[in-house]
Structures are given as C-alpha cells and as structure tokens.
C-alpha cells in the first residue's frame, strides 16, 4: 500500500538557549521574519517564516531546559537540511553566509573532505551551525537531476 499523498516538510522547531539572539540570527541568515508568538507551558515559541510560509522555523525556550550546548550524538535531532535546486545556488548561499560571518562547520556529523561545499555522490552540501551549535545543511541534488 502506498502513502495517500506525498508529504513535505512543513516546519522545523528548535529549542534554543537565547531566544532573542536566535531569532535575530535566523531572520538575518535566512531572510525570514517573526510572524507569531506561541506561548506554551514553561516557555514560549516564536514562529519565523518567509512571506508565503514556504520556509517556517519555530524557535522555543523552555524554563526547564538544561542550557547545554547542542550535540547531535544525543537522542533527538541530528541536523536540519534545507533543499536548494542547484550547486550554483549553494555557491550563492556560501557568499550570503560569509556576509553574515557564518562559516562552514568545523565539525560535521560525518566527514566532509571538501570545503566549504562538499560534493558527494548524492549531491552537494554546505554545512554550518547556528548559535546553539545545531548543524544546518543546505543541499542540492547532483547536476543533471
């Protein structure tokens, strides 16, 4: 039995240590805007999105957060990958990230032998980290796909 409809990513929600700093960073780097506050028991979330909501990132704080730095070896989120159409798009993003002082991740969850954009059999990837050390990837399929 096949799934009824293809699914696609609706949003990503991340717990952060400094909500205001993370909101500013994500808005600057991704060109998105604060859209909505979402109060919840023990904290608050802020939804950030572009105008057509094709990219939506929710950032949350929790009163009970241990305020430890993120590490992908713990159970839960490993990293977040965002899709781009071409390697040329990755190159433009590389320049954009550099303009904001964002550098390629010094460590990734797998070896990256090419810097800053790694070309692997299944595509090309640019890996960087947010202020809480969460690994973010921009991914483009192999050319010709």
PLM features: residue spans?
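Vicinal oxygen chelate
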Residues: 2-5, 8-17, 47-51, 69-145
């Amino acid at each position: 039995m096949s799934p009824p409809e293809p699914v696609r990513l609706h949003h990503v929600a991340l717990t952060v240590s400094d909500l205001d700093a993370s909101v500013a960073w994500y808005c600057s780097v991704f060109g998105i805007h604060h859209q909505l506050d979402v109060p919840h028991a023990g904290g608050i979330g802020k939804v950030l999105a572009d105008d057509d909501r094709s990219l939506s990132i929710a950032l949350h704080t929790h009163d009970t957060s241990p305020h430890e730095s993120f590490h992908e070896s713990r159970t839960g989120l490993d990293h977040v990958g965002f899709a781009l159409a071409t390697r040329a798009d990755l190159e433009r993003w590389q320049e954009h990230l550099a303009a904001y002082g964002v550098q390629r991740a010094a460590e990734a969850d797998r070896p990256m032998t090419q810097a800053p954009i790694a070309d692997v059999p299944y595509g090309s990837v640019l890996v960087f980290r947010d202020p809480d050390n969460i690994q973010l990837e921009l991914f483009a399929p192999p050319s010709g796909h």
